[in-house]
Swiss-Prot record:
Keywords: Amidation, Cleavage on pair of basic residues, Neuropeptide, Secreted, Signal
UniProt-recorded name of the protein: Neuromedin-S
Secretion signal span: 1-26
Keyword Signal: yes
Subcellular location: Secreted
GO CC term, one of those recorded: extracellular region
Modified residues annotated as Asparagine amide in this record: 144
Organism: Mus musculus
GO terms, biological process: locomotor rhythm; neuropeptide signaling pathway
UniProt-listed InterPro entries: Neuromedin-U_amidation-site (IPR018070), NmS (IPR043253)
A GO MF label: G protein-coupled receptor binding
Family assignment from sequence similarity: Belongs to the NmU family.
Propeptide cleavage-removed residue intervals: 27-69, 70-105, 106-108, 147-153
Amino acid sequence: MKHPLPHYSPILFIYCFCMLQIPSSGASPPLADSPDGLDIVDPERLAYFLKQREIHSNQPKENQDVYKRFLFHYSRTRKPTHPVSAEFAPVHPLMRLAAKLASRRMKRLPRLLRLDSRMATVDFPKKDPTTSLGRPFFLFRPRNGRYTDNNFQ
């Protein structure tokens, strides 16, 4: 393995030469720019910057307050407004309404077929008798694998 110093020696020499300060007449040159390269800041811009910084520093606190209010409001358990059966999990009221409408449609369908004698009754074959468990075909399909029963009105 070669030593890296001979390869970098010209670069090191140029770097040291550029960093070397050559003494001048002893008086410092007049400053064209402000010291340390800093620009003179307009007081209005400084006030605007400080105001924006204060606004952004308060934002995490506001977000935390909103989060606390959200948790306080939604983490409390509420008593249901409807009677809940022990055998069924609580569902959204619209899901309950849809099940009622489906059962109402099923009750109304045979009556409509009897009133209109010209309509032919159609028997729908079931694909697999084990999947229906003795229930008729559904006009409303519940979600999450739950069955619609008329017991939980």
